[in-house]
Amino acid sequence: MRKGLIILGDLKDQDLIWLSRAGQVRDCSANEILIAEGRDVEDLFFVTEGSFAVRVGGREVAEVGVGDVLGEMSFVEKRPPSASVVAKGSARALAVPRAALLEEFRRNDAFAARFYRALAVFLSDRLRSMTEGDDGELDEGLLDTIHVAGDRMLRLIDLLEGAPAA
């Protein structure tokens, strides 16, 4: 199960509807760059189809796929990414503009709280797995919401069906 789903686990259906409307579908072909190392990222990406290679200095360090979230570090820090993300084949992601998210957070405190909590749990889990060794397992506390997160990812994909690609 993709750990990026952690973020969707804390969101509500109304949040998914907003994300699907605020974002734009990005269809990528093989070897297309979604995020370029060292270049500003203005979107937060939710992978909805296919897989992407995460590359540092041209060397693949990870593979991400459906359910993963990309650009989250640049979203939090507003710094250029330290890695590139490249489509491994035909792939699709929902690109939600950072500016739109921040504006919605100003209007909707409850959404902002849910989103930032989910992002904090996601980043905490990532840090814990790096410092304690990643055994591929999710924390027991996260298992309670992971089925909800999977359902939410499927709902997001359904909401995007037929959406025009960028």
Regions found by a protein language model. Give the residues of each.
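Phosphate-/nucleic-acid-contacting segments
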Residues: 137-166
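Cyclic nucleotide-binding regulatory module and flanking cytosolic helices
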Residues: 1-30
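A small-molecule sensor/coupling module
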Residues: 15-16, 81, 101-141
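Conserved active-site beta-strand element of glycosyltransferases/polysaccharide synthases
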Residues: 94
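A generic structural signal for residues located within well-ordered alpha-helices
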Residues: 3, 11-14, 42, 65, ...
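Cyclic nucleotide-binding regulatory domains
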Residues: 7, 32-90, 98-102
